[in-house]
């Protein structure tokens, strides 16, 4: 039973989690054999019951009710949809309707089609001997069915021919989410991979990045502004520069993000920025090695992404080799301002007019309008009906509760 399973895991102080693409387990060495046995059971014979399916489905739907009203969640949803496309897995999002369409049989079919030993890698890190663990794994996973897994195909994401503003109206927003995103061909095997990492660190990879120093330290428009460069071995990666800002500085923030990106493209970074970025990568990399799951992910990446055996052994030396010229070339290749999407999610009645007047590099940017589920719409109309006044609102309310006579009959309020 599921409760017995969870209780035993808790008793051992272990962790065992299952997702749609894999299983992760962690435990003390003395409980390793039993945890490995439970892990094998969850892979080979998962407990897929109607009762648990309905419980998880209802929980997911309840969480969505809150998320649907969240500005940051809406921003992420539309950003992913328009960046990757509706038919790309990274562009899909969960909705009440999509959850209702799923049945337990769909879940079982997914498991049968994709959970194959020929499509799996098992990485074990810890105080173990190879021959001993090989014997145990062979015994426990011996019954795992092999078979071909059919890979899905989907359209290749593209950037717009000219930069455009994607506006998402959220009337309840007290802040705006501004994100500049473009897709890139980028993975760990790229010759300029390490230069791009350093470039991103300098642009907005932390509290010492240019975006943070500009929008937070200098102007005080946000609690933080950051950038990211995300690789993908199988599909397109993305570059993103982002900030959550006050409504009244939304347009100015978008322009400042674009300026900082162009500055990375057009000028060399400083010696101090190079030194700080490399030092930060060195510190983070060394600290990450203390986490066994990080070491396991390194081993998995070497196998699944066709990396050289010494890829992570030479990681820091490759970071150290990056020059200022390398950073500028990588910035020119991956950071874009002319063919990018500028996503702005916020309160249109306060920010839209200024967004429609943004002029960058001598050209006014086109604005497209979307709802919070990524459906393109007409421009929102914020004009107020002339017949509506404070007096009419009060009178309509009085009529709704029964009229003036009923209101005058109220003698006390508790």
Task: Indicate residue ranges for each PLM-predicted region.
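M16/MPP (pitrilysin/insulinase) zinc-metallopeptidase core fold and M16-derived inactive scaffolds
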Residues: 1-29, 89-93, 205-221, 233
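Active-site-adjacent, His/Asp/Glu-enriched structural segments that form or flank metal-binding
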Residues: 1-73, 101-104, 108-119, 251-255, ...
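M16/insulysin-pitrilysin zinc metalloprotease superfamily fold
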Residues: 26-59, 134, 187, 206, ...
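Short acidic/His-enriched helical or mixed secondary-structure segments at domain edges of catalytic enzymes
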Residues: 59-78, 156-175, 213-224, 267-318
